[in-house]
A protein has these predicted regions:
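Alpha-helical transmembrane segments and adjacent TM-loop junctions that form the membrane-embedded core
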Residues: 2-25, 29, 52, 58, ...
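First transmembrane helix
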Residues: 28-43, 140
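Hydrophobic alpha-helical transmembrane bundles that constitute the permease/transmembrane domains
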Residues: 35, 39, 64, 169-173
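Short, hydrophobic transmembrane alpha-helix segments
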Residues: 42-54
């Protein structure tokens, strides 16, 4: 006998789109700003012969693509469930976050390669021009960061975009510093060194986002949900004899789900009934854990052995 229910929260495709779609307008503004700065920095990099500027513009170009994918993911995440896609397309934002990680890694590799080439074949960078375009890039990135600051706490998709823009802002600072060094001392290696620093700044943020994204795709238990504690709370419910096939995973940002087979004594089922038992389990988990949707299968004693025989 089985029963599924939720905690009274929104769930399914609507909930999946909520965390990210609330920031759709801000993502669009950040995308427009980023595309504009890509063009400006490419022009500046060519005029100033600055690898740091060119590398930063290449990084920002991947960011623009990432922001575009984030917006596309929102579109798919808000599509309703179907017979085949029973959770809707909520996980589109997780795939977008993964793609952003790969783009960031590619951008970092490109910057490292070009920096090494610049050490082998030095070039004369125009410090003043590089400084001007570096400042323009920094101001634009700070505006984009302010647009995405709040959303990055609620959505992996938005967080991916936020981290990319943050890396760009740090990259702009690095360009500014290297430009000042070249202006004051004429030391040209400052430009490729700045490029390597940009690559190093990309790596740790990308790794953190990649781990979180893979955790969702591998259906690991949601962060903050202790499965041992969940089991203990279920077992503490009056009439519950055992719990098995306990699983918790995350569909997308802000949508953790849980399922369990709960063995209940015949006396408890007779005394309180299935509906009340489900409400007690609901209250048990709803009061202690942040789970968007729960599915419980209530079973009599010995049913687990019956399931095992059916599976072999």
């Amino acid at each position: 006998m089985g029963a599924g229910h939720d905690h009274g929260h929104a769930h399914g495709a609507a909930a999946a789109g909520t965390a990210t779609s609330a920031y759709r307008g801000r993502l669009r503004m950040a995308l427009a700003i980023t595309l504009g700065i890509v063009v400006v920095q490419i022009v500046g990099g060519v005029l100033a012969d600055s690898l740091a500027l060119v590398a930063d513009s290449a990084h920002m170009a991947t960011d623009a693509l990432g922001l575009g994918m984030a917006l596309l993911a929102i579109h798919f995440a808000n599509r309703p469930p179907s017979e085949r896609a029973t959770f809707g397309y909520a996980r589109a934002e997780i795939l977008a976050a993964l793609a952003n990680c790969l783009l960031l890694l590619g951008a970092g590799g490109y910057v490292v390669y070009e920096s090494v080439q610049r050490f082998i074949t030095p070039a004369q960078t125009e410090g003043r021009l590089a400084l001007l375009f570096g400042v323009i890039g920094l101001v634009a990135n700070l505006v984009s960061l302010s647009l995405l600051m709040r959303g990055q706490k609620e959505s992996l998709n938005v967080r991916g975009a936020f981290l990319e823009v943050a890396a760009d802002a740090l990259g702009s600072v690095t360009v500014i510093v290297s430009s000042v060094v070249i202006m004051l001392t004429g030391w040209q290696p400052a430009d490729p060194i700045a490029s390597l620093v940009i690559a190093l700044m990309i790596a740790p943020r990308t790794w953190k986002l990649l781990r979180e994204t893979l955790s969702v795709l591998l259906e690991a238990a949601p962060k903050g949900v202790d499965m041992a504690e969940v089991r203990s709370h279920i077992l503490a419910t009056d009439g519950v004899e055992d719990v098995h096939d306990l699983h918790a995973w995350t569909i997308t940002s802000g949508m953790p789900v849980l399922s369990a087979h709960v063995v209940v004594s015949p006396e408890a089922l007779s005394a309180i009934g299935h509906e009340k038992m489900l409400h007690e389990l609901q209250g048990c988990l709803g009061d202690h854990f942040d789970v968007e949707h729960c599915t419980f299968q209530l079973e009599p004693s010995g049913h687990a052995e019956h399931e095992a025989r059916l599976c072999h």
